[in-house]
Amino acid sequence: MLRIKSSNLRQEKFQASASLSLRWPVVSLLQPSLKFPSIMELRINVAHVERIARELGVKAIHVGAVAHLFSEGSTVPFIARYRKEQTGEMDEVKITAVRDRMEQMQAIDDRRSSILKSLEERNLLTDALKDKITKADSLTVLEDLFAPYRPKRRTRATIAKDKGLEPLADWIEANQSDRSANPTAEAEKYVKPDAENDEQKVKDVAEALGGARDIIAERFSDNAEIRAAMRKLYQDQGTVTSKVLYGKEEDAEAAKFRDYFDWNEPLKTIPSHRMLAIRRGESEGFLMMRVNPPELNATALIEGMATRAISPGADQMKLAATDCYKRLLGPSMETEMRLESKKKADAEAVKVFADNLRELLLAAPLGQKRVLGIDPGFRTGCKVVALDAQGKLLFNDVIYLIGSGNTLMQAKELLTNVVKHYHIEAIAIGNGTASRETESFVNKIGLPKHIPVIMVSEAGASVYSASDVAREEFPDHDVTVRGSVSIARRLMDPLSELVKVDPKAIGVGQYQHDVDQNQLKASLDDTVLSCVNGVGVELNTASKQLLSYVSGLNSTHAANIVAYRNENGAFKSRRELLKVPRLGDKAFEQAAGFLRIRDAEHPLDRSAVHPERYALVEQMASDIGCTLPELLSKPELRAKVDLKKYVSADVGLPTLQDIMNELNKPGRDPRKQFEVFHFQEGVEKPEDLQIGMKLPGIVTNVAAFGAFVDIGVHQDGLVHVSQLSDNFVKDASEVVKVAQRVQVTVIEVDLPRKRIALSMKSKPDFEKKKPSGPPGQGGGGQRSFSSSGGRPQQGGGMGNPFGGGDWFTQAASKGKK
């Protein structure tokens, strides 16, 4: 469960670094002003601000304002909604980008300071070197500049230096243009076969020249210009090559990586999912991956930068260049490219996960209705719960849909009585094992037609049911009851319930266990924070898990709010929050606008208008001769308000327009209206599918290569990116989103290989695709059937979308070699 918000930890780190190095002036955000200090007045690194402004296409003063607001403890949602004038109306994406780039540049500055200190302490810092280090704008450039001076372990070059061969290396470099210079003759001066110390012995000319070349090769490897040129060569001409390890070709577990047994692709164009698939094959011991440019081009690059002469000395330089690439610079650059390509793939995979999670969290809520929740099952039975409109558990029991007719009659009687007794308004059925069978049974027992029966994703429900949160909520019930409650509540309000589950257990990510876990957690936490505050939170009913994601609040604040609420009853006003222990003015300022009180004493407490603007709205009402409630309830009165009259040093038109929009629809929910969805009747298992069949479906996952769609057969089908539209589609997320309802056509059903291929084209090709090999080899593989009905489970097993298993590797590998 996400209890600690990385965004808050990042915020504290940002504030600490700002207070130490940026020296921000104190400005009260409780009294915001459009008269914002200049960048120079803020004492911000102007170069950083200007660079970020160029990258994002915004004004430098707005970047400085965002940085200042962060240093004062403001959050991304607060800045985006309530400080539009200061930021030039930046959205959350750009505000987050400013934060992240400021952190990156702070890291560069920290490393710069460390390098300068190291060089100064060793008396190695020249004015020219200091100037280069000061101007370096990336960690890569800094490390290249520092490479020749970095304390080294014992290398072939240091061994040669200990033998006294550095002067010979200097001589070769100095005389490389002299055709008459004789390196062999010069090397004879350094031959010392009888030296008392073995570490200083040089037995012959060959050893002397070899040692000199070792020194020269290391100099090439440490040269910042050569490293930069080689890096560009790798980026432009590098190829990712994948080979199967000897003896692994027939390994059953290796079959899922068969596409990559002999694969090569340009580094600059390889998709993230393919890079991650190859890396997984390597980590599991089936593949070997290399990243290299053409060797001749690489050695020629070093030779060309080292010497252009034709002489015996130049020949030694060229030999050193070849050795440098094969032994030093090549392996170093390959490692760097592997790391950089991994970072790029991680970033894209994390973005896919975050985008999918956002769609899932912002799915349309049913609302406050009495719901019957059913967690279906065969052998263990179907767990049934009844909840009131606030999500409180009223009843629980188990029914069995297999066995004698008497068992089915008992199940029918129980459901009928529960629906009638508790005035059930909707039925939620988990979409796991036995879901379609349970749905069919419920639809046939004669319940009122106006009660919708809705399939709900149960991904992560088992994780919630075994969590501390669930045990705290339902200490007297077992995991089966808790899981059923979670399914029912997800129908009522997906956002409020899903925040209790670790997003990685929800199953909407891509290679989630392979990517950088800190980066993944930070991005997902940012996404949850954005969604929670974008929707707003009802203060008197929200769980402490939901409250902990409100802007400005943490888990301690949330727990204290719930404790205060339990002890003193419902909050009657936002201002009452200030009575909560350890919740101060700053937390109140950041949180208040995102908290709603449905039955508040002050009408604006039900809206997203911030308390700092209440006086302004009351002045609007006074100026047109009405009360505040009248202004809120009568559109004709609001139409009389001239917003331009209220522009001041504190408030601009963007904020005024936001206020008026909120007055028009106080506390509006930005999520879509709920619509009942039904799968195709009579299509409940893969064997029911036929080529050309058109079916309704729900998108469950979106990846770069396509979208997975639930069509109600316990197994998601894949709509490959080439089948998403009649037009060319580069990225599946441009066409479909998680939880989107779509119409698909079945174009392939391969039961032995457990694959379903779908199309969203207006005229799809129904021709049966012929497999190019055994499972795992081409053909756009699908998610494998599992005992859980193909539904996502905890962890990275076969049933977890993007969490692991051969189905993903197969699907991800589809493409032309």
Residue ranges and their predicted role:
Residues 34-64, 71:
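Generic start-of-chain signal for non-secretory N-termini
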Residues 42-48, 106-124, 472-570, 590-616, ...:
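Long, highly charged, low-complexity intrinsically disordered interaction regions
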Residues 78, 94-97, 104-373, 379-477, ...:
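Duplex nucleic acid-engaging cores and interfaces of nucleic-acid transaction enzymes
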Residues 189-195, 205, 302-306, 311-325, ...:
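Low-complexity, acidic/Ser/Thr- and charged residue-rich accessory regions of DNA metabolism proteins
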Residues 752-769:
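OB-fold/S1-family single-stranded nucleic acid-binding modules
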